[in-house]
C-alpha cells in the first residue's frame, strides 16, 4: 500500500463511443487503475487518524512480533514489501521451511480498528471457502501479538498464486471468466457477515448521496472542470441507474489483491475496505484497465454466476466510480495539503475532460 503519486506515463488513446454516444474511456482512466493500484484513495482517506506510534517498526521488529504470534515459528529471513503504506507496518517473514508469512501491524487508531473488523470478517468467510461459494482462498489469520501502544499485529501465511497481470486477460473462457466468477461470488455473500464485523452497510439511495457529497466537495476546490462536474451530476441525479440491490463488496480490488495461477483466481487479499454497497465499485478497475476484448467475457461470467441478477446500469456506475476515484485523489491532496498530489489529480482530470468531451455516462 502506498500513498505515493501514481505514475503518469500511460499512453494516450482514443475514445470509443457506442451508438448512444456513451463513452468507454481507455485513457486517462487507465491511470485511475494506477491510482487504485497504489491503494491511495480510499485507504488514505479512511486511515488519516491519530498515530499510535511515531517510529515505523523495522522488519526485524515485525519478525519478532511474528514469533510471538505464531509460537515455534523459526525465522530464516525477513523482508519489507516493495509497496509500503501509511496505515500499516508490513513485513514478509520466511521460515526455515521456506514458507512465507505476512505480518501486519497498525500505525493509526483507525487502521487498528479496521484490522480487527477485517479479521472478524475473514473468520466469518471461512465457512464459505468452497467451490460452490467462494472458489478462492482468503487470508487466514494464524496468530496475533499485542502491541505495547495498543491494538494487535496479525500474522497469516501467504496464499498461492501471483498478482494478476491484466495483460493476460483475454476474450473467452479462461482467466477472464474466472475473474468474473470470483467477483460475482463475493457479491453473493450474505450481507450479515459484513454487518456483524462492524463494517459499513449502505442502501442504494444513501450510497448515491455519498457520491453526490464527494462531487460537491470536489467542486468546492475549484479544480474540477465544469464539464466533468456536469457529467457526474447528470449520472448521479439519474435515479434510474441507482436502483440496484446492495451487495457485499471487497472495496479495494486491484491487480495486487487478486492472485492467480494459470487460468484461475486462487486468492483475494486486502479485505479491510469491505462493505455492503454498490457492486459496481468492484468492477470499476477492470472496466477502465482490463483489455477491451476481455471485458465482455468478465461481465458474461459475472452475470451467469449471480443469482436473481438484474442490474442493467451496472457498468455505467462502474465507469462513474472509476472517474470519481480521481476526485477522491484530488480531495486527498487538498486535505493533506500535498501540492504534488493536487497537481497530479488536476492533470488527470484535465485529461479526463478531454477524452469525455460531449460523451454521456448514461443516455
Model segments located where?
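A glycine-centered beta->alpha junction motif in the catalytic cores
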Residues: 147, 153-169, 188, 212-218, ...
Amino acid at each position: 500500500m502506498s500513498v505515493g503519486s501514481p505514475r503518469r506515463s500511460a499512453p494516450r488513446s482514443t475514445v470509443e463511443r457506442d451508438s448512444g454516444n456513451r463513452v468507454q474511456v481507455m485513457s486517462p482512466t487507465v491511470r485511475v487503475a494506477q491510482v487504485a493500484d497504489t491503494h491511495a484513495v480510499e485507504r488514505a482517506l479512511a486511515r488519516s487518524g491519530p498515530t499510535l506510534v511515531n517510529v515505523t517498526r523495522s522488519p526485524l521488529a515485525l519478525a519478532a512480533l511474528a514469533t510471538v504470534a505464531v509460537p515455534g515459528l523459526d525465522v530464516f529471513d525477513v523482508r519489507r514489501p516493495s509497496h509500503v503504506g501509511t496505515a500499516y507496518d508490513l513485513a514478509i517473514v520466511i521460515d526455515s521451511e521456506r514458507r512465507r508469512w505476512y505480518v501486519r501491524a497498525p500505525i493509526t487508531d483507525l487502521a487498528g480498528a479496521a484490522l480487527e473488523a477485517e479479521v472478524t470478517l475473514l473468520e466469518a468467510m471461512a465457512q464459505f471457502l468452497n467451490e460452490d461459494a467462494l472458489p478462492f482462498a482468503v487470508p487466514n489469520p494464524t496468530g496475533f501479538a499485542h502491541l505495547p501502544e495498543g491494538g494487535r499485529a496479525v500474522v497469516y501465511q501467504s496464499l498461492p498464486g501471483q498478482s494478476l497481470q491484466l495483460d493476460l486477460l483475454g476474450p473467452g473462457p479462461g482467466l477472464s471468466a474466472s475473474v468474473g466468477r470470483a467477483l460475482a461470488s463475493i457479491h453473493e455473500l450474505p450481507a450479515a457477515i459484513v454487518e456483524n464485523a462492524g463494517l459499513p452497510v449502505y442502501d442504494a439511495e444513501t450510497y448515491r448521496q455519498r457520491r453526490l457529497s464527494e462531487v460537491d466537495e470536489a467542486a468546492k476546490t475549484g479544480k474540477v472542470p465544469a464539464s466533468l462536474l456536469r457529467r457526474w451530476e447528470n449520472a448521479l441525479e439519474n435515479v434510474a441507474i441507482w436502483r440496484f440491490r446492495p451487495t457485499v463488496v471487497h472495496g479495494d480490488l486491484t491487480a495486487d489483491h487478486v492472485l492467480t495461477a494459470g487460468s484461475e483466481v486462487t486468492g483475494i487479499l486486502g479485505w479491510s475496505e469491505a462493505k455492503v454497497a454498490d457492486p459496481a465499485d468492484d468492477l470499476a478497475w477492470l472496466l477502465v484497465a482490463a483489455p477491451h476484448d476481455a471485458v465482455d467475457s468478465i461481465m458474461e461470467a459475472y452475470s451467469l454466476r449471480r443469482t436473481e441478477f438484474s442490474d442493467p446500469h451496472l457498468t455505467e456506475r462502474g465507469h462513474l466510480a472509476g472517474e470519481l476515484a480521481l476526485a477522491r485523489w484530488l480531495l486527498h491532496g487538498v486535505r493533506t495539503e500535498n501540492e504534488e498530489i493536487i497537481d497530479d489529480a488536476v492533470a488527470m482530470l484535465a485529461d479526463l475532460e478531454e477524452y469525455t468531451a460531449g460523451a454521456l455516462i448514461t443516455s
